[in-house]
Amino acid sequence: MYRRILVAVENSAADRTILDHVRQLAALTDAEILLVHVADGWAARHFNDLQLRESEEIKADRAYLEQLVASLPGLKVTTELAMGDPANELIRLVEERKADLLAMSTHGHRFLNDLIRGTTVSKVRHMVKVPVLLLKAQ
């Protein structure tokens, strides 16, 4: 059914919701999990243009991805730390990495975060050509 599940994570409690679900799905289908975090701060958006060294924030993002890998024993898990606009990067990576499913969490009603994250979810789900699994964060 699924061979590669791209899971968008954001270093928040919402990640646990989506990972708990995807862990079971990947085990049932023997799918690889591709954990993707998109760093979208100013330094991340200009990282390549300015040839910057990794900031502490980017190092922390890499460490977080490795923690998530360690929390998924027995599963095939790879990671990708992308930099830039979250929606554009997720759309690009779904295609480049040949994901069969995109899994993301949505948030409750936190106005400002809903405006930002809601825009990402809306854009991504309309632009990718694979099924999108959306789970509301607990």
Question: Which residues are covered by each model-predicted region?
Answer:
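Small/aliphatic-rich secondary-structure junction motif
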Residues: 1-52
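General small-molecule cofactor/ligand-binding pocket signal
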Residues: 34-36, 78-82, 133
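Solvent-exposed polar/charged
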Residues: 24-27, 70, 95, 126
